[in-house]
Amino acid sequence: MSEATNQLKITQVRSTIGARWKQRESLRTLGLRRIRHTVVRDDNAQTRGLIAVVRHLVEVEPAQNGTGGKAQ
């Protein structure tokens, strides 16, 4: 693959207690399970839409070299 895809590092920083069902499901779809959990996802329209729904619960930053800073 010659094209490098942009990726985002997404970290859940707030709890889902009191959050609406759609917000909880959006976090699950992103792969976030708990506070301080970080995932790396491709930067595309679908991911951006999910982030928009939960923007107050997460922090988003560009991923460095496609890694989330954690060994997997």
Curated annotation (Swiss-Prot):
Tell me one GO biological process term: translation
Under the heading CDD domains, the entry gives: Ribosomal_L30 (cd01658)
- Give any GO molecular function from the UniProt entry: structural constituent of ribosome
Can you tell which superkingdom this protein's organism belongs to? Bacteria
User: Which keywords, in A-to-Z order, does the entry hold?
Assistant: Ribonucleoprotein, Ribosomal protein
Family annotation (InterPro entries): Ribo_uL30_ferredoxin-like_sf, Ribosomal_uL30_bac-type, Ribosomal_uL30_CS, Ribosomal_uL30_ferredoxin-like
GO (cellular component) term, any one: cytosolic large ribosomal subunit
Pfam families per UniProt: Ribosomal_L30 (PF00327)
Task: Please describe the quaternary structure of this protein.
Answer: Part of the 50S ribosomal subunit.
**Which family does the record assign?**
Belongs to the universal ribosomal protein uL30 family.
Q: What's the protein name? A: Large ribosomal subunit protein uL30
This chain's source organism reads Mycobacterium marinum (strain ATCC BAA-535 / M)
Q: From which lineage does this chain's organism come?
A: Bacteria, Bacillati, Actinomycetota, Actinomycetes, Mycobacteriales
